[in-house]
From Swiss-Prot:
Binds 2 heme b groups non-covalently. GO terms for biological process: mitochondrial electron transport, ubiquinol to cytochrome c. One of its GO terms (molecular function) is metal ion binding. A ubiquinone binds at residue 202. InterPro entries: Cyt_b/b6_C, Cyt_b/b6_C_sf, Cyt_b/b6_N, Cytb/b6-like_sf, Cytochrome_b, Cytochrome_b_C_euk/bac, Cytochrome_b_N_euk/bac, Di-haem_cyt_TM. Signal peptide: none annotated. PANTHER family: CYTOCHROME B (PTHR19271:SF16). It comes from Ficedula parva. This is Cytochrome b. It is a multi-pass membrane protein. The cytochrome bc1 complex contains 11 subunits: 3 respiratory subunits (MT-CYB, CYC1 and UQCRFS1), 2 core proteins (UQCRC1 and UQCRC2) and 6 low-molecular weight proteins (UQCRH/QCR6, UQCRB/QCR7, UQCRQ/QCR8, UQCR10/QCR9, UQCR11/QCR10 and a cleavage product of UQCRFS1). This cytochrome bc1 complex then forms a dimer.
Amino acid sequence: MALNLRKNHPLFKTINDALIDLPTPSNISAWWNFGSLLGICLITQIVTGLLLATHYTADTSLAFNSVAHMCRNVQFGWLIRNLHANGASFFFICIYLHIGRGFYYGSYLNKETWNVGVVLLLLLMATAFVGYVLPWGQMSFWGATVITNLLSAIPYIGQTLVEWAWGGFSVDNPTLTRFFALHFLLPFVIAGITLVHLTFLHETGSNNPLGIPADCDKIPFHPYYSTKDILGFALMLILLVALALFSPNLLGDPENFTPANPLATPPHIKPEWYFLFAYAILRSIPNKLGGVLALAASVLVLFLVPLLHTSKQRSLTFRPISQVLFWALVANLLILTWVGGQPVEHPFIIIGQLASLSYFTIILVLFPLAAVLENKMLNL
């Protein structure tokens, strides 16, 4: 009998084991779609990014004009640019929902998968930051100046680090050149580490909404979840194209339509919406080093989540007290995002400080305590 090529070919069998014959829990919901949506986001960003890179010039005197030229004179350049800029927003929407899903259903107990995922989040944030600098508008320039300057808060070596990152004594041509190099490189690093993320995931298999072992009831990934994923792709791409065609500048900053000018500071320097929660935490601490540490902690705290799991149950499905805390955390992040976009004045300062404090309190203190309380109440 002829061998089944799909199951025996060295290359095809890897793809088969990951996308076709993969045993998958039969009860996973639409919240499990976001992993594959992130894959589609990455592919979309790499393809549109490569097309943009063919017309972009990484030079301070030419960068802004090269982007304008792309939108005016290149066939469908406006569309490619709008898809790329808004694709970043969709990337972050998907990754935040993906992390929220992992948090809610206890997927972080697959520790290696979770930790690699946090590394992927950090890489994505780095990529988005250096990418935002490339059009060399006002907010690009001042965003780069403010955020790279945070390195100077590091004692003793801070100033040296900043000048090393800048390639000079201010954000200038060397900075733009290296940021373009990094922005080109990092998505491919993300693609590589995504494979590591998947490898670790397939060691244990997917979690499910009940948070219980599902080995007794698994179904093949294809055709069930492949079909479900394609529906997700269609819905997301429809939303992305709608945003890129109807309201491409909705999420951008009008300040970035002005070419970078080192002599004029914009009235409100703020990052893109997906960084506002961290920016609000940074601003809520009146000390520079303290702010930088809080900014780093706001994302790095995710590494601690598996260590703080005190419940005897994996998921929050049957834990109402922790559910209330979870949604309080979501609301808290939305408040931080809103405050991050507001000017630094009363009452936004105190709102930001309280929201920052409650962000860390909920994750580091209240979640572990609530889980212990629930264990007691359920006599576990």
